Amino acid sequence: MVKSNKPRKIHLNANPTPEALAELSIGDIVYLDGTVYTAREGIYKRVLEDGIAMPLDLPAKSAANFHCSPAATQHDDGSFDLGAVTATASFRFSKWIGPWLAASGAKLIIGKGGMSSQDYRDHFVPHGAIYLTTVGYGTGALLGRGVKQVRDLHWKEELGLAQAMWVLDVENFGPFIVESDLEGNSLFERENARIAAS
């Protein structure tokens, strides 16, 4: 819902309540606490097209899907160091986003550059989900500071590190900008229209 032109700083749980989501306005600055997971085309194809069961109990464990390929180093003991968690462009996943929201119960999609307002209206609004965008380029290391630990890693052998599902415990993870709200409004489209009209 569009409530104000002034952005606010919001701390949001990665399993947000409907009430918490309803309070968000496009342009708000969001920091996440809780557990987020990465999923992109490899995961989407495996679950939605190949019919393989999800490796994580969603949305109970997390309702926040990050479009990301972590820059990770794996140690001999199996633990990881994440140097950066850099978002990837979400528009590439448009064909899967509706079915994924339905299957996963995700309420937060996090990525780079947003998606179309048509995607927001057709897929996000019916599922009570919003889109959070990263802030510019080169923020992967900044976001990495908010990752407290790698809780789990699923389908590494099948998909490789970039496409595997990373399950990350995060704290003060951000900043992200609310790009879409529960009504399907798009911050980027609103600002582009204002620029075009000026």
Task: Please report, for each region that a protein language model flagged, where it lies by residue.
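Short, well-ordered loop/turn sites that connect or cap secondary structure elements
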Residues: 24-25, 30
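Short secondary-structure boundary/capping segments within folded domains
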Residues: 20-24, 55-58
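Feature captures the catalytic cores and cofactor-binding loops of soluble hydro-lyases/lyases
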Residues: 38-173
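Short, charged beta-turn/beta-strand-edge "cap" motif at the junction between a beta-strand
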Residues: 18, 29, 35-39
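Short hydrophobic-aromatic micro-motifs
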Residues: 30-32, 66, 178
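Short alpha-helix capping/helix-loop boundary micro-motifs
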Residues: 13-19
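Short, basic/aromatic beta-hairpin or loop at an interaction surface
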Residues: 1-11, 103
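Acidic, glycine-rich flexible loop/linker segments
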Residues: 7-11, 150-198
